[in-house]
Amino acid sequence: MLLCDGLGPEPPRQRHRNRTSAARIRKRPKCCCGDGGSGNQAEQPGGIVSNPISYGQSLTTLARVTAAALTTAAMLHTTNALAATGSSSASNSSTGGIALPLGTATPATHELNATQPFGGSGLNFNESGAGLSDHHHHQQHNPDEDWLDNIVWVFKAFVMLLIIIAAICGNLLVIISVMRVRKLRVITNYFVVSLAMADIMVAIMAMTFNFSVQVTGRWNFSPFLCDLWNSLDVYFSTASILHLCCISVDRYYAIVKPLKYPISMTKRVVGIMLLNTWISPALLSFLPIFIGWYTTPQHQQFVIQNPTQCSFVVNKYYAVISSSISFWIPCTIMIFTYLAIFREANRQEKQLMMRHGNAMLMHRPSMQPSGEALSGSGSSKTLTLHEVEQEHTPTKDKHLIKMKREHKAARTLGIIMGTFILCWLPFFLWYTLSMTCEECQVPDIVVSILFWIGYFNSTLNPLIYAYFNRDFREAFRNTLLCLFCNWWKDRHLPLDIDIRRSSLRYDQRAKSVYSESYLNSTTPSHRRQSQMVDNL
């Protein structure tokens, strides 16, 4: 091979010696037909030129930079292609469907939104798909930022887990208390017990799967469980809302139409209402979801192509029907019924106060002659007036106490309705805006917060009972004390107690365990404890 006209072909031995180990670039003397000063370069022993070595190193560095740039460009091109695919699918879904409010899995809708907790290795795309981070970038992260992200992740997981546990334990306490206390076994509390069961199922079937998605950032189960989760979420959330609507109707008949209440709200009618409350959500959740009536053709194709992702997109017809049955119609009924309840409660309270005032004015003049004639037949007059007062006052007091109890129950249930609206209204407002405004985009973190605010309504109902209702508060206290006493007794005093035995027989058997001073004590605290043990 001729390198130059002035130079002959390079000798083979020199051609092999003049190669660098990095880029394998062949070195040769400068051509004499080039610059005049270039031919004065000094040659070291062995035929190796000193200056071309630095030139080869620069070429090697340039080659490495070029390769890195090409690799980065290829990765960015791949990222843009994925982003274009995600945007096209999002545009198709936005034109043909929207996310279902009560059953969607927004944080795991597509792979670009599946973030990894604690900044794990591997590719991690952001929400828009335009950003790219690899293991080298994770190594350059600030340790303080990683520590803060870990703290936020732990706090989020702790709050969600606390909501789940509180919802399960609180509603379970409601069910046990109503079963134990006879005074709470009224028709209204049938709806309350059924509502507590629905809230427990919301915590178990809906919150747990959402908790898994929020913590891990991806769907960890099969596609069948994805559809099952969405169905259960819609089903139990709708059932909980319909229970609140039935409670408002029951209170409406009890206060606004008290004469028709025993005829209208019989056990048969209550059973039909509860049956309808549990059946109608199934027609809205399981049937359309598993048949495929709820979604669009684009989403069905997406599910086939991505079986490991839990995405849930619905068409507008299903969205309008589901939102109306799940929230807007029950909310409208509850608002009208409770407005009528509060109006009637205020009217009855004014009438009772007026009657009580008139009764006091009528009794005051009749009591003066009895005070003046204390001798002779005066005592008989006083006795007669006392008997008349005793005949009329208990009836009025009983009616007044009953009305106050009804009003207190209505106030408690009104607070429950208010918390229900505050918890679910922001979510359904976002849902309505997503239907009407297709260009409006809400961050995934905001949607997740709206979901858990709605879930939090299932946790608040037992707290409202305990704070605003004295009967429930006492029942909760007695139930917790009973559970604690049973736990303490089984742990420290393992006795085989038959609750069907009489208290006297139980005391005779317990003499060998308890001291005589405890059994024969007359202090009030010990009496209360012994009575509590006898009631077991």
From Swiss-Prot:
Which residues span the membrane?
158-178, 191-211, 234-256, 271-291, 321-341, 413-433, 445-465
Q: Where in the cell is the protein located?
A: Cell membrane
Q: Where is this region: Disordered?
A: 1-26
CDD domains cross-referenced by the UniProt entry? 7tmA_DmOct-betaAR-like (cd15066)
**Looking at the keywords, is Iron-sulfur present?**
no
State a GO cellular component annotated for this protein: plasma membrane
Q: Which domain of life is it from?
A: Eukaryota
Q: Which Gene3D superfamilies match?
A: Rhodopsin 7-helix transmembrane proteins (1.20.1070.10)
Q: Which GO terms describe its biological process?
A: adenylate cyclase-activating adrenergic receptor signaling pathway; adenylate cyclase-activating G protein-coupled receptor signaling pathway; fertilization; G protein-coupled receptor signaling pathway; ovulation; positive regulation of MAPK cascade; positive regulation of synaptic assembly at neuromuscular junction
Could you tell me the keywords of this UniProt record?
A: Cell membrane, G-protein coupled receptor, Glycoprotein, Membrane, Receptor, Transducer, Transmembrane, Transmembrane helix
Q: In which tissues is it expressed?
A: In the adult, expressed in the superior protocerebrum and the optic lobe medulla of the central nervous system, nurse cells of egg chambers in the ovary at oogenic stages 1-10, and spermatogonia and spermatocytes in the testis. Expressed in the oviduct epithelium. Also expressed in the spermatheca. Expressed in embryonic and larval ventral nerve cord and brain lobe, embryonic and larval salivary glands and larval imaginal disk and midgut. Also expressed in larval synaptic boutons.
Give yes or no: UniProt keyword Membrane. yes
What InterPro entries would the database entry show? bZIP (IPR004827), GPCR_Rhodpsn (IPR000276), GPCR_Rhodpsn_7TM (IPR017452)
Glycosylation site list:
18, 92, 113, 126
Q: Where is the composition biased (Basic residues)?
A: 14-26
Q: Give the molecular function GO annotations.
A: DNA-binding transcription factor activity; G protein-coupled amine receptor activity; octopamine receptor activity
Give the knockout phenotype: Males appear viable and fertile whereas females are sterile. Female pre- and post-mating behaviors, such as courtship and post-mating rejection, are not affected and sperm storage appears normal. However, ovulation and egg-laying is severely impaired and females display a strong delay in copulation rates. Ovaries are enlarged due to a higher number of retained eggs and the small number of eggs that are laid are not fertilized. Larvae fail to respond to starvation by increasing locomotor activity. Reduced growth of octopaminergic and glutamatergic (type I and type II) neuromuscular junctions.
Membrane-topology annotation of the record? Multi-pass membrane protein
Checking SUPFAM superfamilies in the record gives:
Family A G protein-coupled receptor-like
Extracellular membrane side: 1-157, 212-233, 292-320, 434-444
Q: Hey, which stretches end up on the Cytoplasmic side?
A: 179-190, 257-270, 342-412, 466-536
Q: What does this protein do?
A: Autoreceptor for octopamine (OA), which is a neurotransmitter, neurohormone, and neuromodulator in invertebrates. Essential for ovulation and fertilization. During ovulation it mediates the OA-induced relaxation of the oviduct visceral muscles, by increasing cAMP levels and activating effectors such as calmodulin-dependent kinase II (CaMKII) and cAMP-dependent protein kinase A (PKA) pathways. Positively regulates synaptic growth; an action that is antagonized by Octbeta1R.
Q: Which family does it belong to?
A: Belongs to the G-protein coupled receptor 1 family.
Record-given protein name? Octopamine receptor beta-2R
**Which species is this UniProt entry from?**
Drosophila melanogaster (Fruit fly)
